Curated annotation (Swiss-Prot):
It comes from Oryctolagus cuniculus. The chain crosses the membrane at residues 25-45, 48-68, 85-105, 112-132. It comes from the Eukaryota. It holds the Pfam family MARVEL. It is a multi-pass membrane protein. GO terms for cellular component: membrane. Glycans are attached at N108. This is Proteolipid protein 2. Keywords: Glycoprotein, Membrane, Transmembrane, Transmembrane helix. May play a role in cell differentiation in the intestinal epithelium.
């Protein structure tokens, strides 16, 4: 009964709006929108570079849906923090390389805009990778300082 209520339209919309207000949700939405804008700029100029934007936009949508629907808790055999970290790290590196190539070539205005937006995407994906780094989120507990064998 609870599963059917969770999959209803108002519940789905509430889950979407609730997740999209979190830091991870905002980052994923920003990645999706930025990849779409870069895709439009590359399509107007040179379509050879547009595959990176398509792949990263699709991956960001997939991760948004996975986190929004709490599917990451239902599939514990996949290490989601590491998967998301490597996705964002690789995206940042590839956007940096692609943007440098595009800006060095000096094409038309849409190509230059795509290169500059690609550098912005590098910063956004790098920021996301920094905050999703799994070892950064682990908290170490303090070692007990009380003697366990009694007073000395």
């Amino acid at each position: 009964m609870a599963d059917s209520e969770r999959l209803s339209a108002p519940g789905c919309w509430a889950a979407c709006t609730t997740f999209s207000r979190t830091r991870k949700g905002i980052l994923l939405l920003a990645e999706i929108i930025l990849c779409l804008v870069i895709l439009i700029c590359f399509s107007a100029g040179t379509s050879g570079y547009s595959s990176l934007s398509v792949v990263e936009m699709v991956l960001a949508i997939v991760f948004f849906v996975i986190y929004m629907c709490d599917l990451h808790t239902r599939a514990p055999f996949i290490n989601w923090p590491w998967s998301d970290f490597f996705r964002t790290l690789i995206a940042a590196i590839l956007y940096l390389i692609t943007s440098i190539f595009v800006l060095v070539e000096r094409g038309n205005h849409s190509k230059i805009a795509a290169g500059v937006l690609g550098l912005l995407a590098t910063c956004l994906f790098g920021y996301d990778a920094y905050f999703t780094f799994p070892l950064r989120q682990q908290r170490h507990t303090a070692a007990p300082t009380d003697p366990t064998d009694g007073p000395v």
